Regions:
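Periplasmic-binding protein-like
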Residues: 146-151, 158-159, 190-206
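Short, structurally constrained coil/turn elements
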Residues: 7-9, 32, 109, 190
């Protein structure tokens, strides 16, 4: 996509890849002398709370988009829907039946569950949203108790980016990852030794 853009418009593109939180911190630090032109990724919440970092832009095709997915902020354009999934390494989970969030609270999975930091990764934030909704909602004490129990099992092994999560599972370093659909399915289609599990409790597409 980038080479085609460069060829058509004669513009050289410098691509910087990082976690969503890291990218927003970079934009914040450069706001007096902006360097970046476009950012991809992140969640609606992150854009809604950082409007001062962006110029207004609404695509001329906005009215042709389903109403629920139109640009409503004036500066952020939804471009994809991605669901939270569990990515499972079958070799490291033999004898375990992992179908949803409730199946992750197994003592034998301690230190073997990969996740990124919800404060820095939009997919990790989506996972936090999903598991809270699945366990009763944001205001439910039992839901937060589940999160506490899960992160106790995660045992401090919190990655800096979403890509590290699915790569760790595919490479056999971790047994289960809290990931999202697009890269997980791509890995599966490319022949990686993984299973993609849509949590039985339901999954949120953001």
């Amino acid at each position: 996509t980038i080479p085609a853009f460069e060829e058509k418009y004669g513009i050289k593109v410098e691509l910087i890849q990082a976690g969503t939180g890291e990218l927003f911190k970079k934009l914040e630090s450069e706001k007096e002398a902006p360097v970046a032109d476009v950012i991809f990724g992140g969640s609606y919440t992150q854009y809604a709370t950082h409007g001062e970092l962006f110029e207004n832009y609404t695509s001329k095709e906005n009215d042709n988009v389903i109403k629920e997915y139109q640009n409503t902020t004036g500066y952020s354009t939804p471009y994809t829907l991605d669901g939270s999934v569990l990515i499972v390494n079958p070799d490291l989970t033999k004898g375990m039946n992992i179908e949803g969030y409730s199946d992750l609270l197994k003592p034998e999975l301690k230190g073997k569950i990969a996740t990124a930091d919800p404060a820095n990764s939009s997919s990790a934030f989506a996972q936090l949203t999903n598991m809270l909704q699945a366990q009763g909602g944001y205001k439910d004490d039992k839901a937060w108790s589940y999160v506490k129990d899960l992160f106790t099992l995660i045992d401090g092994k919190i990655g800096s980016s979403s890509s590290g999560v699915y790569k760790a599972v595919a490479d056999g370093e971790m047994a289960v990852g809290l990931s999202y659909e697009d890269p997980a399915v791509k890995l599966l289609n490319d022949g990686a030794n993984i299973k993609v599990v849509y949590p039985k409790e339901g999954t949120v597409f953001l």
